[in-house]
Amino acid sequence: MSNRELFNEACQYIPGGVNSPVRAFKSVDGIPVFAKKGNGSHLTDEEGNEYIDYICSWGPLILGHGHPVIKNAIIEASAFGTSFGLPTQLEVEMAKLVVESYSGIDQVRMVNSGTEATMSALRVARGYTNRSKIIKFEGNYHGHSDGLLVKAGSGALTFNMPTSPGIPEEIISQTLVCTYNDLSSVEKCIAEYPKDIAAIILEPIAANMGIVPANAEFLKGLRKLCDQHQIVLIFDEVITGFRVSYHSCPEYLGVIPDMVCFGKIIGGGLPVGAYGGRKDIMEMVSPSGPVYQAGTLSGNPLAMRVGLAQLTYLKEHMEVYEHLESSAQYLENGILKILNKLSLSYQLHRQKSLLTLFFTTQPIQGYADVQTCDTAMYALFFKEMLAQGILIAPSQFEAWFISDAHTKEDLDKTLDAVYNALVKCHDSLSD
């Protein structure tokens, strides 16, 4: 069946034809690519078209598709069993590896998704502080739990629905929204609710409104404010965890949070999430403490074995991070040269192996700047890239993910496609 035929059939049985909104390609006015198989840096769809893949499952596939370490781990796990509803040695090994890799955390609890991780972390922070309000930032996305789907990024920004219908006002009222990279907005918020704020949660590198890093002064200021007011500082590292560095953002950015949320890379492509923190905070979690959180498939042996295999490989092969940086820098420099050659002033942001080409001339610091992007132009660009066999995010507000499997040949083909696509996009406007 063709992608179009599959999508038409999917729309009969699945809301919008997809199980996560961005996959519908709606924001680029396209038909979804229905994936059939992946190999290394390449993905093949149901029509037999092959693409150089920069979606990479939205982040988990840091080693690329079908890496032998991942394949072998899946085979090994299936021989033992996929779910027991009991603790396993794998959970212990996984938790130990995560804790030892991340500065400032003593314990970690496994869950099934990034959404579960952030939702649970906030519950624990509220229980620990005995406070109810939280601060988040415009354009930061922390999953689809009610209290966090307020002025959010990712699909909420892509589809211009930053605050979803279906969330009661009494829940929204507990979420205070501040401006990313603007410490004064946080100071004003704390001054208004000095004894009510349990936690500040943020993406230390925002990756769900495109790549927008928090500046150093902003992060250090948040750390200081949280210390002064006994507020729990939570880093959402679902995307950045184990990607920007094996030791994640504390090593890369130099600020240590009180709690952290993981997902994506720690599962090696299987559904997984985790949240961790200092021992005094994590001891609030049941059965050690009174804050309840549970899950039938939390810490399931299949995800644990595969995640453990990927993290162990990364730990033992730190050259992966050198290759990722080299590849990403090569791609960044190539795109900058193209923009200069074509006299285009679009904004290109890169943080390690995460990249976004913003179709705006406005310097990007936060949510308001991102909203100046020409999404119609991005849609044209996306289609031209796809036609040349390059699969990038079907949304202006999502990142490109570079994997260890991407080769120089892949990058050169990508740069050729970027040049051709930009030329065609701008020719179409002048016609």
Model-derived regions: residue spans:
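Conserved N-terminal phosphate-binding loop of PLP-dependent enzymes in the Aspartate aminotransferase
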Residues: M1-D431
